[in-house]
């Protein structure tokens, strides 16, 4: 009996392992009129930390960030911000208290809401699962690579 269960478990695991795995890459998306096509990971981090607050054409950068408890937010906090949730909150409280920014990031609650706001707000930038990108937004290359390319840094 144990041998039968073990062989069924191995067969099921083998079948799962052969299924294609969805991309877990995070795409950085901007309003279509934003005059940026490529950012280094360092430049992206500077934007997300609000150290750079304007695009080259002097349009204010509007940062849209997913609400807590989303996989995309957790990934971005770890990879781009290099902070946990508590450090992220404290960072923005301190930044606003020192009057370094007029406001913190706008919070979005879904991919659909993210896309709708990026489309509607000139200068906006955000992140979504690369599998959910639509033609309504512009995907920014990071270090010269798109989310579908090997070596993309946000995977």
Region annotations inferred by a language model:
Residues 18-155:
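Exported/periplasmic ABC-transporter solute-binding proteins
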Residues 13-17:
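Sec/Tat signal peptide C-region and signal peptidase I cleavage site
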Residues 1-11:
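Bacterial N-terminal signal peptides
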């Amino acid at each position: 009996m144990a041998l039968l269960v073990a062989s069924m478990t191995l067969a099921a695991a083998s079948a799962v392992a052969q299924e294609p795995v969805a991309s877990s890459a995070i795409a950085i998306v901007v309003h279509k009129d934003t005059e940026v096509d490529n950012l280094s990971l360092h430049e992206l981090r500077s934007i997300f930390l609000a150290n750079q607050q304007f695009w080259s054409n002097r349009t204010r950068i509007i940062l849209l960030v997913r609400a807590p408890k989303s996989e995309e937010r957790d990934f971005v906090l770890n990879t781009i911000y290099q902070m946990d949730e508590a450090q992220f909150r404290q960072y923005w409280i301190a930044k606003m208290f020192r009057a370094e920014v007029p406001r913190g990031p706008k919070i979005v609650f879904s991919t659909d809401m993210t896309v709708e706001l990026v489309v509607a707000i000139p200068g906006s930038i955000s992140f979504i699962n690369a599998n959910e990108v639509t033609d309504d937004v512009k995907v920014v290359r990071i270090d010269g690579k798109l989310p579908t390319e090997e070596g993309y840094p946000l995977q």
